[in-house]
Amino acid sequence: MATKNKPNLSVQDVKLLNVNELTPLTPNVISRQATINIGTIGHVAHGKSTVVKAISGVLTVRFTSEFKRNITIKLGYANAKIYKCDNPQCERPGCYKSARSNTEDNPQCERPGCGGRMTLLRHVSFVDCPGHDVLMATMLNGAAVMDAALLLIAGNESCPQPQTSEHIAAIEIMNLKNIIILQNKIDLVKEAAAQEQYGQILKFIQGTIAENAPIIPISAQMKYNIDVICEYIVKKIPIPVRDFTSDPRMIVIRSFDVNKPGSRVDEIKGGVAGGSILKGVLKIGDEIEVRPGVISKELDGKIKCSPIFCRIISLFAEENELQYAVPGGLIGVGTKIDPTLCRADRLVGQVLGSVGKLPEIFVALEVNFFLLRRLLGVKSDGDKQSKVKKLSKEDTLMVNIGSTSTGCRVVAVKHDLAKLQLLTPVCSQEGEKIALSRRVDKNWRLIGWGEIKKGTVLTN
């Protein structure tokens, strides 16, 4: 069966699909689905969501509580297509343009008297992370799916602000090398102040993973220099290497119940899982498994996991219907799962993939860890508070593994090895990176990172 819902997008047909020939820039893939994930990171109220809106035309703030307080709370997401005009007389950066993901593949160039057609170069998915310090765990979950990051720094405040440094540390943990720095709100400051802050930014990024990142002055509200961001996304962010031939695996970062109250029984739809495919290709009709699935406690206190088995009945990338989905941008997977299991993000942190091909479910981990020297983003009187204390037995920490956040207890520590007993089981594998946070002044603070050496498998 082929997709036909949008006449101006290229048609996908599962029968003609050859996974060995797919690339992240295959035309009938990027016509409908984003294949590169870019995160927006930075301090609270520095304009992350506004930049995403300026590039993609999509407002990522979806919840009333987010509107009222003007902050992002859940992970926002939006897709955008990036085009370049095929007329050689069309000068850069104006020849680059971005549009919503359901825009046709070769629109007319909008510059007066140009007459060229736009060529689709990239289809990107923005993961809009919260900048608020209390929401650090949400930001780390988003970092798990990023290929690159836009670091926002507001031009009307000194640099660095607390969460700016905390987010830089987080992307160093995730080993995210492709970074573009945006000096936002440039319309609010005089030229001398902007130059002075440019110096502060250069000093701040020295010795960090963002050391050689380009710095672009922009105004997201006035849409000033947005075309330059598009050009830099195309030129500075390499196309990630993707694995299309392995068994599919996807991490879930959002999940929904799409039914309205009062629906008739025959109208009820199954739950929807949103996330990013790490490897392999998902197709409509595939039999899938979700792990760890439903977690329950027995009477004797033993934890039991029942993986969920179901079929894929629809695939979407924003408003675009898909017949198959590839690794990269965020997609929605419509399933036959009971909607109550998916509502209000209940499936977040689970792993979805081919039946019997997913990693083990662990209840305890042995990790090789590294601690930061001092706490980031904490304003303290002296040096005493901000130093990171060593891990000790019976410490309670929070671990982020992929898009899962769970509490854990330190059972044993020796040099840079620790054994962690998890509060809830996770589906993971050896070699996966994890982030560690500790509770400081009622908030979780990033204290270090580690790598899973081995795990204790859950026995049902």
Curated annotation (Swiss-Prot):
Region of interest: G2: 70-74
InterPro entries hit by this protein: EFTu-like_2 (IPR004161), eIF2G (IPR050543), eIF2g_C (IPR015256), eIF2g_dom_2 (IPR044127), eIF2g_GTP-bd (IPR044128), P-loop_NTPase (IPR027417), T_Tr_GTP-bd_dom (IPR000795), Transl_B-barrel_sf (IPR009000)
Region spans: G5: 219-221
Residues involved in GTP binding: 45-50, 184-187, 219-221
Region annotated G3, chain positions: 128-131
Keyword Protein biosynthesis: yes
Any one of the GO CC terms: cytosol
Location in or out of the cell: Cytoplasm, Cytosol
Record region (G1): 42-49
Segments for region (Interacts with cdc123): 450-460
GO molecular function: GTP binding; GTPase activity; methionyl-initiator methionine tRNA binding; translation initiation factor activity
Example of a GO biological process term: cytoplasmic translational initiation
EC number of this enzyme: 3.6.5.3
First-tier enzyme category under EC: hydrolase
The tr-type G domain, residue ranges: 33-241
Region (G4), start-end ranges: 184-187
Keyword vocabulary terms for this entry: Cytoplasm, GTP-binding, Hydrolase, Initiation factor, Nucleotide-binding, Protein biosynthesis
Record-linked PANTHER family: EUKARYOTIC TRANSLATION INITIATION FACTOR 2 SUBUNIT 3 FAMILY MEMBER, EUKARYOTIC TRANSLATION INITIATION FACTOR 2 SUBUNIT 3-RELATED
The family this protein is said to belong to: Belongs to the TRAFAC class translation factor GTPase superfamily. Classic translation factor GTPase family. EIF2G subfamily.
Biological function: As a subunit of eukaryotic initiation factor 2 eIF2, involved in the early steps of protein synthesis. In the presence of GTP, eIF-2 forms a ternary complex with initiator tRNA Met-tRNAi and then recruits the 40S ribosomal complex and initiation factors eIF-1, eIF-1A and eIF-3 to form the 43S pre-initiation complex (43S PIC), a step that determines the rate of protein translation. The 43S PIC binds to mRNA and scans downstream to the initiation codon, where it forms a 48S initiation complex by codon-anticodon base pairing.
Name recorded for this polypeptide: Eukaryotic translation initiation factor 2 subunit 3
Species in which this protein is naturally found: Dictyostelium discoideum (Social amoeba)
